[in-house]
Design a protein with these regions (language model features):
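Cytosolic covalent-transfer regions centered on His/Cys nucleophiles
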Residues: 4-5, 9-169
Length: 169
């Protein structure tokens, strides 16, 4: 569809599937305006959720989800995850060292129990996310994390990465 919303002051538009119709007075009142504004905000939020969902799903591969995989250190966890991406042909050989270099600059952990390690350069064949969810936390910088999402970024798809990354935090 080319439009998401019809504003009808004639009360002659019939409701349609997947299309919102707002009935208003012939001369739009404050109440009508608030109703329009509310529906527009809902539609924008739905669209943002849909875009985020689609971009996030495009990062995911079922073989790159693991539960309760533990390593002795952050470095070992990064090596394990990055080397798996290399072995699958998704990331180049230099990927592991690039992720470790990035992590050395500042830890990629956050106070919401999530770490998002990623490479300094956009070098993977496609945008990819490798997720490990652990019951027991791993100390990662100043935070304990239970969800590790290693991100590989493709140069041509880097704006999608920025969008997903900013919406994950």
């Amino acid at each position: 569809a080319y439009y998401d919303l019809i504003i009808d002051a004639t009360n002659q538009v019939l409701p349609q599937a997947n299309l919102r119709v707002i009935q208003t007075n012939t001369i739009i009142t404050e109440h009508d305006f608030k109703k329009i504004q509310s529906v527009c905000n809902e539609l924008l939020a739905e669209k943002k959720r849909r875009i985020f969902h689609d971009k996030l799903i495009s990062f995911m591969d079922p073989q790159l989800f693991e539960k309760n995989h533990y390593e002795n250190s952050v470095e070992d966890m990064i090596r394990y995850m990055a080397e798996k991406l290399v072995a699958l042909g998704i990331a180049p050989e230099a990927f592991t060292d690039s992720v470790l270099e990035r992590e050395a600059v500042t830890p990629t952990s956050f106070d919401n129990k999530v770490a998002i390690p990623h490479s300094i350069v956009c070098s993977t064949q496609k945008n990819i996310g490798f997720v490990i969810v652990n019951e027991k936390p791993l100390r990662w910088g100043t935070f304990d994390v239970q969800i590790i999402m290693m991100i590989g970024v493709n140069h041509q798809q880097r704006m999608d990465f920025k969008y997903v990354y900013s919406n994950l935090l």
